[in-house]
Structure formats: C-alpha cells, structure tokens
Swiss-Prot record:
InterPro entries, alphabetized: AB_hydrolase_1, AB_hydrolase_fold, FrsA_esterase
Name of this protein: Hydrolase phmG
Active-site residues, as the UniProt record annotates them: S259
Keywords, alphabetical: Hydrolase, Virulence
MF terms (GO), sorted A to Z: hydrolase activity
UniProt lineage: Eukaryota, Fungi, Dikarya, Ascomycota, Pezizomycotina
Family (UniProt): Belongs to the AB hydrolase superfamily. FUS2 hydrolase family.
Name of the gene: phmG
C-alpha cells in the first residue's frame, strides 16, 4: 500500500450538475453516523427526487419522516427505547429536510403555509428522542428583550447537553461550549455536530436559536441582526447558573459556529468571558460575498446612483424566474431579514462584516477554518482575511485549518466530515483549557 492520494478528486454526485442539491443531500447523509439518517431511507428518498421539481424533494423526505416516526412509535410501544430514539431522531431530521426548499417571503403571512408546522414538528420529534440519548439534556429558555419600543421579552429555546458520569473529566468540572446556529440551520440539526461530539468528551454544550433562526423566526417573526451577540450574556449566564448539582466551569467557556454561525461566533468572542472560539468556515464580509458575481460595471452604476434599486430588483427577479436556487436564496434572506426587495437585501448584507478592525477586539484563542470546495465562500477572501485580522494574538492561539478535499473537511461547514471537524475543534479546546487525555494503545 502507498500513502499517495487516491485517484479521485471529487465526491459522488447524487444529482449530476446540480451542486446545490448535491450539497444539501450530503448534509442530510452527514447525520447518519449519529442517528439522523439511515442509508436505505436516504437512498430511497434520493431516487424519488426529480431535481427539476422541488416538490418531489419535499414529498420524498416527508414520506421518510412519516416512516421513521411510525417505526419509532412501534418501538416505543414495545419498550425498545433504542429503536425509538433512533426513529425519532431520523423523523426529525427528515422533517427538517422536507421543508428546506420551500420558498418564503419577508413576513410571516408570506412564509410557506407549512413552514411553522414543519418547524414545530422538527422540534417535537427531536424532543421525544431526548430521554433516550446517552447524555443528560435539559430543555432551557433564554430571555431576550426585543429591541423595540414595547421592549417585549421573548424566551429563546435552547438545549443544554451534559456529559454523563462516564464521560466527565477527571477534575470534575465541566467546560462549556456555546454553539450558535447559522442562516438556515435549526438547533435540532446542530445536535449532530458539536453536541454529540462534546458530551462524549466531557463538555457541556448549549445550543439556542436567536432572532431570524428556526422556531424563533417562524413563531415570533423576529428578524436577524448583525450584532446577533446581543441576545445576551446575561441570559446565557443565568441559564448555566441554574443547573443545580452540575459543576459547570464558567471559567472555561468557548463559542463555536459554522458558516454564518462562524461569523456570529467571532462576534461573540470579543466578550472577555469567552475563553476560546472555533469559527467553522465563516464569511469575512457578506457584501463582498453577495456581490462577487455581479458585473463590476453594473455595481459601479448602482452604487454610484446611476441606476436605482428598482432596476436591480427587476434584473434579479428576472433571474429568479428561471433559476430555482436564486429564487430560494432570495426567499431565505427575505424571510430572516424581513426584506422584500432583492436590492435592499444586498444592501443589508453590508451590515454583516468583520472589516474595520472588529477582530482586534477578540483576545481569546481562535481556530478558524476554511473549505476548499465551499459552495459559497472563497478561502482567500474570507478565511485568510479573518486569520490575518487576528494577527495580534499569540501565534500558538491563532490557528487556521483549510482542507481542500471533501473527505478532509473541504465542503462548506464541514458537511460530510463532522467527526473530523469535532476532532479538530475539541482538540483545540482541550489545548486551550489545559485538558490532558490519557492516551490509549490499540
């Protein structure tokens, strides 16, 4: 045997020529090692999907969700809690997938008619699996005061995953990872990444949804904000301190997120109470990303005032008629920002940036990653600019991991390589927090 690279350079294409659907398919398959997908169910659903008809995607995954839920109910009736757990996890995962391609608008009335129902179903199915997981899981609520004249308080839903006695660290104290979501994920999907990898390593992991995300968007209509970290340390801290009888180490708190969640993690890392940050494939500047493939001449005419927003809207909407992915992307951003105009959506992107020295405020160790096969972010324009702006940190506490091949973590958000991503992330956190693990010979 040789150590040379195998004679392939890409990943299997479930839908040849459709990068978007291929990526979303691998995203679902990525949860298989941790209970979110079954190989035969996955392949059966894929075979039923016509890439030119988005409704077949919804129908295929809805069917698999119903099948998995039925299996879970049958297992539960017989006292087989392992099969019940697995069935409920898969049903929740497939339900999320079933609604993923629905087109939404800027107001709750303009969301897809099934959007809220699907969000609630994802949550309820997932919660039915919680009592049977191999860790303690507490459903928590984090208070958030809406930035409006009414100052209304909304309770943000979260899950706190705690390691069982078998996985506790020798010193008895439990380090904490705050795991943020991104633009289109839900926290039930986050379980398959850092939470399942954290509790088995002795970490507590807190996931939560904030403005513009998941059920918070669908139920309360709260829109995303660039300073997302204002969801509040006070709320996280009080939630963690309420865990009576559990010795959470509030001097060892880290934050992690992927894609847009990586941007949020970097913003949150400026808080001195955050002792480490893992930013998985974040963007550096959303405006640069959103306008990269638009003609420079056209951009100059628009930003220079020679053409107005109405012209930009017309051109983008013309493209939306024939390009489903563009139509879906505009719908997603319209929903989480509450903006109908494509031109105004692009302008909103300019608020989501780490330019201007923001990262100089970050004083904790940071691991930032990039993805050579990213569907969205160029590594030089995003990953390396983040890394360069962290130049004030000690070299040993400013790390970059930028794999290129899919099996090495080269897809956006480390899709298809969650296990490897956790090995890198928790290895870095162990080092920062001084956690030494006993080496075991095979």
């Amino acid at each position: 045997m040789t150590n040379s690279s195998p004679p392939f350079s890409t990943i299997h294409q479930f839908f040849p020529g459709n990068t978007f659907l291929n990526f979303e398919s691998v995203r679902i398959l990525s949860t298989a090692p941790y209970g979110g997908c079954d190989a035969a169910e996955f392949l059966t659903a894929i075979a039923a999907i016509n890439p030119k008809d988005p409704q077949t995607w919804a129908d295929a995954w809805s069917h698999m969700a119903h099948l998995a839920e039925t299996m879970a109910e049958e297992a539960l009736s017989r006292g087989d809690v392992v099969a019940a757990r697995d069935g409920f996890l898969r049903a929740s995962s497939y339900t999320r997938a079933s609604g993923y391609l629905y087109i939404n608008g800027p107001t709750l009335d303009e969301h897809h008619p099934l959007a809220f129902e699907i969000s609630k179903k994802v949550q309820s199915l997932f919660r039915r699996a919680l009592p049977f997981l191999d860790c303690d899981v507490h459903v928590v609520e984090i208070p958030y005061v809406v930035d409006s004249p009414e100052r209304k308080e909304v309770m943000l839903p979260g899950y706190l995953y705690l390691p069982n006695a078998q996985h506790r660290l020798p010193d008895g104290k439990i380090p904490v990872l705050l795991n943020t979501g991104g633009a289109d994920s839900v926290q039930e999907e986050l379980y398959y990444i850092h939470p399942q990898g954290g509790h088995t390593r002795g970490y507590a992991v807190l996931t939560f949804e904030g403005p513009g995300q998941g059920i918070v968007l669908r139920e309360h209509g709260l829109h995303m904000r660039p300073d997302w970290e204002v969801t509040g340390w006070k709320g996280y801290s009080s939630t963690l301190k309420r865990e009576v009888g559990v010795e959470l180490d509030l001097d060892r708190i880290a934050v992690a997120g992927a894609s847009m969640g990586g941007y949020y993690a970097l913003r949150a890392a400026k808080d001195s109470r955050i002792k480490a940050c893992v930013a998985i494939d974040p963007f550096y500047d959303m405006w640069d990303f959103g306008t990269k493939h638009i003609s420079g001449l056209f951009m100059s005419a628009w930003t220079g005032g020679w053409i107005g927003d109405d012209w930009v809207d017309r051109i983008i909407r013309l493209g939306m008629r024939t390009n489903f992915q563009l139509r879906w992307e505009v719908g997603v951003t319209a929903a989480f920002w509450g903006i109908a105009s494509p031109a105004k959506i692009l302008k909103e992107m300019s608020k989501y940036s780490l330019k201007g020295g923001y990262l100089e405020k970050v004083q904790c160790p940071v691991l930032v990653t990039g993805a050579g096969k990213s569907l969205y972010f160029d590594t030089e324009e995003h990953t390396m600019k983040v890394f360069d702006d962290l130049g004030h940190l000690e070299e040993r506490w400013r790390r970059v991991w930028m794999p290129n091949r899919p099996e090495e973590g080269g897809l956006q958000a480390k899709i298809g390589a969650f296990g490897l991503a956790n090995m890198k992330a928790y290895g870095f956190l162990d080092e920062v927090f001084g956690i030494r693990r006993v080496t075991v010979e095979s």
